[in-house]
Design a protein with these regions (language model features):
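Type III/flagellar secretion export determinants
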Residues: 1-189
Length: 189
């Protein structure tokens, strides 16, 4: 048992503060994964504790940031639009446009650089806003790609994803025009 005096002595001897939020978060994760029946050792506990900060928040191994875990507590509350930096929206707009042109309107998970745009955004946001910021960025990204597809269809009504984008089709589209609801697409007569 984790709370037996002999186990507690071993943990303390190993330098583990059993009152810390970090320890409690690791123990909670172990209990959840082990359904309460745990067979473990001190090193396994230390390894798991290294995945949490002093506040007991999970540290994303790719970014080193907290606030990026979807949990039972936040699962239904992070999907709302929040204010995100204009520089991040601009970075996503430029990348989405470049990738839309390079991939003929398809999404290519092998070549995209989207993750770096999201990671840059997360670094600019407070921990408690990171999930909502990511969700907000997804909404902007979808809006940008939709505007690009509509512009390609204005130039060539038969265009569909995978076909070459008509030359100049995206030239008149700005991030500001998409975000304000105006696509700023000139229709050639």
């Amino acid at each position: 048992k984790m709370n037996s005096s002999s186990v507690q002595k071993q943990l303390k001897a190993a330098g583990i503060d059993t009152n810390s939020k970090k320890y409690k978060a690791a123990l909670s994760e172990m209990m959840k994964n082990g359904n309460g029946a745990m067979f473990t050792n001190v090193q396994a506990i230390k390894n798991l504790m290294s995945q949490y900060d002093k506040n007991g928040d999970w540290i994303d191994p790719n970014t080193g940031l907290t606030g990026l875990a979807v949990t039972d507590e936040n699962r239904n509350s992070y999907k709302h639009i929040i204010s995100i930096p204009e520089s991040s929206r601009e970075e996503m707009f430029e990348l989405a446009k470049k990738e839309f042109l390079n991939e003929n309107g398809t999404l290519n998970g092998d070549t995209t650089k989207r993750e770096s745009v999201y990671n840059n955004l997360y670094r600019k946001m407070d921990k408690d806003d990171r999930l909502s910021a990511g969700w907000t960025m997804e909404q902007y990204e979808h809006q940008y790609r939709q505007a690009f597809a509509e512009a390609a269809k204005v130039e060539d009504p038969t265009w569909r994803a995978g076909k070459p984008i008509p030359a100049g089709a995206l030239d008149g589209i700005t991030r500001e025009s998409v975000e304000s609801g105006r696509k700023s697409v000139d229709i050639k007569l």
